A protein has these predicted regions:
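Short, charged, amphipathic alpha-helical segments
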Residues: 9, 75-83
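Conserved catalytic core of two-component sensor histidine kinases
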Residues: 12, 82, 89
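Sec/SRP-type N-terminal targeting helices
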Residues: 1-62
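Amphipathic alpha-helical coiled-coil/helical-bundle segments that mediate oligomerization/assembly
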Residues: 40, 78-79, 95
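Acidic donor-binding helix in nucleotide-sugar-dependent glycosyltransferases
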Residues: 14, 77, 98
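Acidic, low-complexity, intrinsically disordered peripheral segments
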Residues: 91-118
Length: 118
């Protein structure tokens, strides 16, 4: 009789522990989702800014090229314009990559990635 009560008490404790682990997992998933969602939104905004920056860097490069061909710009200044354009292209690729990583993480957490596997 004492063993039976102890077993019942232990079973209740195990049920409570399982419930707590489930709640902890749910809270952790919600926090992860919230963090990835905010990172995704930030990366989307950054991507927009980098796209604008790329347009400006491209225009700057075109102007520099015209000036270089006219002899009004040194080779070093032309290389700086080229480097600026390459840096802008690299930043936009990095922003696209980071945005996609967040998107994949959101799909994974929400279970949406399973649609891509079917």
């Amino acid at each position: 009789d004492g063993n039976r009560r102890r077993e019942q008490r232990n079973a209740r404790i195990e049920i409570d522990n399982a419930r707590l682990r489930t709640e902890q997992l749910e809270l952790s998933l919600e926090a992860d989702f919230s963090n990835f969602w905010q990172a995704y939104r930030n990366n989307v905004e950054l991507l927009k800014l980098e796209e604008e920056n790329l347009v400006a860097a491209n225009e700057n490069y075109e102007i520099a090229m015209e000036r270089y061909l006219l002899g009004d710009l040194s080779g070093i200044e032309m290389r700086e314009a080229q480097k600026s354009l390459l840096d802008a292209e690299e930043r936009i690729l990095s922003a696209q990559y980071n945005t996609k990583l967040c998107e994949i993480s959101l799909l994974q957490i929400s279970g949406g990635i399973l649609h891509y596997l079917d």
